[in-house]
Amino acid sequence: MTEVSVETSSAGSESPSIPLPLHVDPADLAAELAVVLSERVGEEYLLYERGGAWVLATGVRAMVELDSDELRVIRDGVTQSQRWSGRPGPVLGEAIDRLLLETDQLFGWIAFEFGVYRYGLQQRLAPRTPLARVFWPHGRIVVTRDEVRLFGASAGHRDDVLGVLGDGVPDVREASAVDVVADPSDYRDRVASAVGEIAAGRYHKVILSRSLEVPFALDFPSTYRLARRHNTPVRSFLLRLGGIRAVGYSPELVAAVDNDGVVVTEPLAGTRALGRGEVRDRQARDDLESNSKEIVEHAISVRSSLQEMTEIAEPGTAVVTDFMTVRERGSVQHLGSTVSGQLGTSNDRMDALEALFPAVTASGIPKAGGVEAIMRLDEGPRGLYSGAVVMLSADGGLDAALTLRAAYERDGKTWLRAGAGIIEESTPDREFEETCEKLSTLAPYLIARQ
């Protein structure tokens, strides 16, 4: 029999703890609990992996919905709505802070379009464009390699956890891979257009993306389990929230703010394939570390991130560490750096998020020109793609993972999406190849819904 111990959380509530058997993989268990506790009963949820812990937020006690023209707070079946104007950060932050007076953590996602306001491009958004969805869950379950801990969860949830552990996590089914080389969106032509605009001096860099349709309904939890075994993300996520499903393996942090006010962002720019054998991987790494195009792309991204950090950090505290090291992320390897600073006394986490969002590695340089070009040249609104999945805490903390290397489903359509950084030295064929490399993080591991 599995033993259950009970401790008291920092909020004063009891948090049952269940030891995790050695043979159980925590990622597999967390995804299966999402199925048992949320998928089967039609509840919204978000699973977020950070630092060796998988946090499953189940059910919606209250929801904050921010659109381009309206803020809604939904609680106990009652919707309070208001028009808003100005910057979205303070509007969302105030609604979030009110909920965090009553709970420890909130979870959600931020759309790419949240970031266009900083550059005065909001007039290009359609009415009711989704900007953010953040919720207060009914319960949280935290899975580590040692234990399962329940916060605010019902006795039924505890019994469900024990049931899954007793029955065992089922095996995942066979994947149905999709071909990543189709180019129905004329991606190469759009890259060529961007290179021309860069040569004309309109901007220095832009990230253009392409979507790849998945021709079957996706089993998101099973796909999460299988693909997680083949990826090394800085964060991973699985969610059904605000009308969208997503599963992904984030390669970098847009922003993290800890309870001491330390802000961190980790730009990755410069890419080569990985997983093609030791010799080819070493050759690709050597090329990545010596290729002038990749080095320039990374250096200007880090400079941009440092400038943004300086805006919201205490003077003299913004620094670059671990500069231009190779970081492996599933089917690709990147040049990566860490930029950090001490949050200024007059700023908060939403100021940090607005300054760093959208990620420089998913938008462009300068960001104003890059974002404007994306709104013209990319495939319609990005939504969750290149936005962020977020976890917020009552102590002022924020963890925002860049939403890349992911699959999405909305309104019966399922797709993948990937991009590449375009600079003047770019060639359409190489940038298309880079999108194929990034799509291969997930494309071989898609499992069809039964």
Which stretches of residues belong to each language-model region?
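Non-catalytic accessory segments adjacent to catalytic cores
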Residues: 2-8, 77-215, 440-450
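An anion-binding catalytic pocket shared by soluble metabolic enzymes
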Residues: 50-67, 128-130, 134-140, 207-296, ...
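Extreme N-terminus nucleophile/cap motif
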Residues: 1-76, 83, 202, 206, ...
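Conserved hydrophobic core element of enzyme catalytic domains
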Residues: 335-338, 342-450
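Cytosolic ligand/metal-binding cores
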Residues: 3-7, 74, 83, 145-164, ...
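A residue-level signal for conserved active-site and pocket-lining positions in enzyme catalytic cores
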Residues: 64, 108, 141, 201, ...
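Cofactor- and metal-binding active-site motifs of prokaryotic enzymes
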Residues: 26-63, 74, 113-161, 245, ...
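Short acidic (Asp/Glu) and glycine-rich catalytic loops that position anionic groups and cofactors
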Residues: 12-17, 202-205, 312-318, 331-334, ...
